[in-house]
Amino acid sequence: MNSLFASTARGLEELLKTELENLGAVECQVVQGGVHFKGDTRLVYQSLMWSRLASRIMLPLGECKVYSDLDLYLGVQAINWTEMFNPGATFAVHFSGLNDTIRNSQYGAMKVKDAIVDAFTRKNLPRPNVDRDAPDIRVNVWLHKETASIALDLSGDGLHLRGYRDRAGIAPIKETLAAAIVMRSGWQPGTPLLDPMCGSGTLLIEAAMLATDRAPGLHRGRWGFSGWAQHDEAIWQEVKAEAQTRARKGLAEYSSHFYGSDSDARVIQRARTNARLAGIAELITFEVKDVAQLTNPLLKGPYGTVLSNPPYGERLDSEPALIALHSLLGRIMKNQFGGWNLSLFSASPDLLSCLQLRADKQYKAKNGPLDCVQKNYHVAESTPDSKPAMVAEDYANRLRKNLKKFEKWARQEGIECYRLYDADLPEYNVAVDRYSDWVVVQEYAPPKTIDAHKARQRLFDIIAATISVLGIAPNKLVLKTRERQKGKNQYQKLGEKGEFLEVTEYNAHLWVNLTDYLDTGLFLDHRIARRMLGQMSKGKDFLNLFSYTGSATVHAGLGGARSTTTVDMSRTYLEWAERNLRLNGLTGRAHRLIQADCLAWLREANEQFDLIFIDPPTFSNSKRMEDAFDVQRDHLALMKDLKRLLRAGGTIMFSNNKRGFRMDLDGLAKLGLKAQEITQKTLSQDFARNRQIHNCWLITAA
């Protein structure tokens, strides 16, 4: 009897143990990452040929303590290598693990290689050659703390390399994991199986091989036992012949069918090639089809299983499309696949909850470094009186109501950008802004007292409901997470896409960027203030301080301002402002753009203006500003400097976003100024629910 070890992916050990026992293995013992077992020579070959779950089958040769590199060398040399393979065979060493002595795996592999070579040369035998790429013998050494475990890898290449798949493409799952997913899916061979996001077809091919009794090792060309001195070619040929006979019989007798689809024509072509190489192409129908076009191929036929490994995303901007995808799949399953089973393998359990289905079973597994879950569902058959499940129903109803109200109003006003929803319902704490045919959903960061998983799930529900109610394509929704406005949050860079969208606001054309920054380049709550500036600016010299992207300057210029001066510390935003001006035909010397610390520029400027707009940050301590700025503390000093630049009869429009801001009216009076609050006049319908989003004042000479 041989003592053997089969390695596998984490989470699949018990499944592998059952498989090995069914093959005839005895004394199976599960450990993390694999199964120890015993079997005769025939079982060695059968486990290699038939195991769908093992990553490698290894023959342990011994262990040694490693307190020095000499210990490793002597421990390896103590094994009788000349009984393991002939000197004419090539070999390679795979070394993993480190300790205080062996701190580099390459060094460890070199010491093992030296010990093996010396074992031959000391017996006056020819020196065996090393072949790292295609060796006849693979030696595996695993160092854990002070113990090195040495084994012969009888697999050669990993057993997931079945021989049917083109390795050039990126594979989301290995064949061994795919086989485990099939086994855990609840699918019964002989019933239909469908994968609507099949990629290169691995799940379907593994299922078809399982169903037709086709050994996973049947198409492999190389094995790790070819140079093994104890290899029994006669027994191997018997095992191989039996596998070929069973495969022919299984294919001839199998009557059910497999269905795969994917939106990418290139991967479908690869899937067809893989199925042909696996010998089961006649059983699988592959189609180029998006999930949105998914239909039940057997409406009147037997119930089957939908099995898939859907995409998931780690980037925030990919989530809306994935949420929409999972929500759509859930709806299609309920509408067209009543009575079927569904099994999905995913690295994002939160996305699976978008299906709006209750899982009957779930399994955990590792896909490389990723923690994954597989959930199995039974889709109930629909009845005539069954109603479709609503996602975030309260939120969806409010959004639908707001849409009906604001869409008509915005059209009449001549604006394309407006707020549709602003945390109207406390449990759905987001803002939803429309920019032409795009939508930006901003999630206000939830309090730490809110369970993070629940908050994330609610956000997913919001996105699914938003896409459904507004009828937009998922790629037209942009998701952002932010805290309530603080300091210079609007200057935070998020991306580098550089994609700008042209929008209209009354008679102005403006560029917005929905993806690269926390804000979009257009503060929607200041829309009426900008229109007022346009109406007040005819024939006047206009100054815009803390100008951001210059949208207020555009309105002033279109309103007939004699000149405009736009000042901001950011070169990025000044260039943006210049693009906005150019888009509206406002070019030339009459329209100046100045990059400067606004407060320092204000103290030094000696020009005169008829109309000044200033919208400073609530607080700023930018390294490029000379002093920290607090709008509540410093607004009077600001007005003192502004008064010096204000021409007789001129007006300052002063706005800020500080909640609870108090204007120092007495201090203004001492400066010879007076203030009129116009906040309510500057709040349009879409911001009427949030009366503290900004405050706005007109300041003139007393």
From Swiss-Prot:
Any one Gene Ontology molecular-function term assigned to this protein's record: 23S rRNA (guanine(2445)-N(2))-methyltransferase activity
UniProt entry tagged with the keyword Cell membrane: no
GO cellular component terms listed in the entry, alphabetical order: cytoplasm
Main location: cytoplasm
Keyword entries, A-Z: Cytoplasm, Methyltransferase, RNA-binding, rRNA processing, S-adenosyl-L-methionine, Transferase
Location in or out of the cell: Cytoplasm
Sequence ranges assigned to domain THUMP in this UniProt record: 43-154
Signal peptide: none
Enzyme kind, highest EC tier: transferase
InterPro entries: 23SrRNA_methyltr_KL, DNA_methylase_N6_adenine_CS, RlmKL-like_Mtase, RlmKL-like_Mtase_CS, RlmL_1st, SAM-dep_methyl-trfase, SAM-dependent_MTases_sf, THUMP_dom
Domain of life from the UniProt record: Bacteria
E.C. numbers: 2.1.1.173, 2.1.1.264
Reaction equation(s) it catalyzes: guanosine(2445) in 23S rRNA + S-adenosyl-L-methionine = N(2)-methylguanosine(2445) in 23S rRNA + S-adenosyl-L-homocysteine + H(+); guanosine(2069) in 23S rRNA + S-adenosyl-L-methionine = N(2)-methylguanosine(2069) in 23S rRNA + S-adenosyl-L-homocysteine + H(+)
Keyword NAD: no
Family: Belongs to the methyltransferase superfamily. RlmKL family.
Function as written in the Swiss-Prot or TrEMBL entry: Specifically methylates the guanine in position 2445 (m2G2445) and the guanine in position 2069 (m7G2069) of 23S rRNA.
HAMAP family on file: 23SrRNA_methyltr_KL (MF_01858)
Protein name: Ribosomal RNA large subunit methyltransferase K/L
Gene transcribed to yield this protein: rlmL
